[in-house]
Regions:
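Extended alpha-helical scaffold regions
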Residues: 1-344
Length: 347
């Protein structure tokens, strides 16, 4: 709340409110960068984030909201985005996307160790996820947890889980596993998964041109790298052919791998390089590209858009390696012939 000495002056009250939001953003960014580059993921901290998100509606419940102007509302949205990025980073999706090593125990797996060694924190997380229907911001979290818990089920099918952990994952009604329920929840139309992901990838946090909120280029690229892991999670869990509409997913890929006008392209080109040198080797990560390539030329635009995005190049920042990789992929397109109607044959 505002001090009484400030509340009576609209100008100073607005400055105070803006400063308070900037402090929240600064603290969250410090926490994100610590977990991104320094600290190991913590299940207890993840549970704290989810509980904080529920209490504050992911930062949207602010005591001084009545004084917000357009800039303050934009900062408030960034607080929501930062909380989501912080929670997703604590889930270590990049490790969860890797192939499960044969015979490994859950506590020894880099992707599972935080949750496997702290069943109480995992249970706290699941309790919060049960409240997901109240806020579409939970959709990316449901998707992320589905990936990690699927991996935990895979490990548990070969190596017995610790009894307390197994009890946490036990399904009382003998229905689908928890990870399947979370995945179904994420894709429920009411959760607006693709709209929420679009909002995340277009957040000012990911822009380097405007230096939004004073964030550095490295911070913006770190958020984009975390989002890339979230993006690959979609096709890791659901084959693109089963999605009712591929266009929203193609949109997300283009926004992730293509720099916005004025943004620094070098770091984003590095994401394209990572895709062509590492991700392309995994069928699930390359499945969207393979799907649009098979559908070409009957469905023309998706492949063209992905080729443009994954080329990793810009007029002022060429990237020959990624362009070459993209051209090699296009060289294996089954056909570039289009079937013309009879009325156009003599044109």
């Amino acid at each position: 709340m505002l001090p009484s000495s400030v509340a009576g002056d609209t100008h100073y009250a607005s400055l105070w409110v803006r400063h308070g939001l900037e402090r929240q953003l600064a603290l969250l960014e410090v926490a994100f960068l610590l977990y991104y580059g320094r600290l190991s993921p913590s299940a207890a901290f993840l549970a704290d984030i989810l509980e904080c998100g529920h209490r504050t509606q992911f930062g949207q419940r602010q005591a001084n909201a009545s004084l917000f102007d357009a800039d303050a509302h934009a900062k408030c949205r960034c607080i929501r985005d930062l909380l989501l990025f912080l929670a997703i980073e604590c889930l270590n999706l990049e490790a969860a996307l890797d192939v499960v090593p044969e015979g490994i125990a859950a506590p020894d797996d880099a992707a599972l160790a935080p949750l496997a060694t702290d069943p109480d924190a995992l249970e706290r997380c699941l309790v919060q996820l049960e409240k997901a229907a109240s806020d579409v911001a939970y959709a990316p979290l449901l998707l992320s947890f589905a990936l990690v818990l699927r991996r935990l089920d895979e490990v548990g099918s070969h190596t017995p889980l610790e009894p307390r952990l197994a009890a946490t994952l036990d399904v009382v009604d003998h229905g689908p596993q928890i990870w399947r329920r979370l995945l179904q929840g994420a894709f429920d139309p009411s959760m607006q998964l693709f709209d929420t992901l679009h909002s995340l990838v277009t957040s000012p946090l990911l822009r380097t041109a405007t230096r939004a909120l004073g964030a550095s280029n490295l911070s913006a690229l770190a958020y984009r790298a975390v989002f890339k892991g979230l993006l690959l999670t979609i096709t890791e869990l659901v084959q693109p052919e089963y999605l009712p509409d591929l266009d929203p997913l193609v949109d997300l890929w283009c926004l992730t791998f293509r720099a916005m006008p004025g943004d620094v392209p070098d770091g984003i080109a590095a994401l394209c390089t990572q895709f062509w040198t590492q991700d392309i080797q995994y069928p699930t990560r390359a499945s969207l590209l393979e799907t649009v390539r098979r559908r070409f030329p009957a469905s023309f635009l998706p492949l063209v858009r992905l080729a443009h995005a994954l080329s990793g190049t810009a007029p002022d920042a060429p990237s020959p390696d990624t362009v070459t990789a993209m051209m090699n992929a296009l060289a294996h397109v089954p056909s570039v012939a289009l079937i013309l109607p009879l009325s156009l044959i003599h044109i």
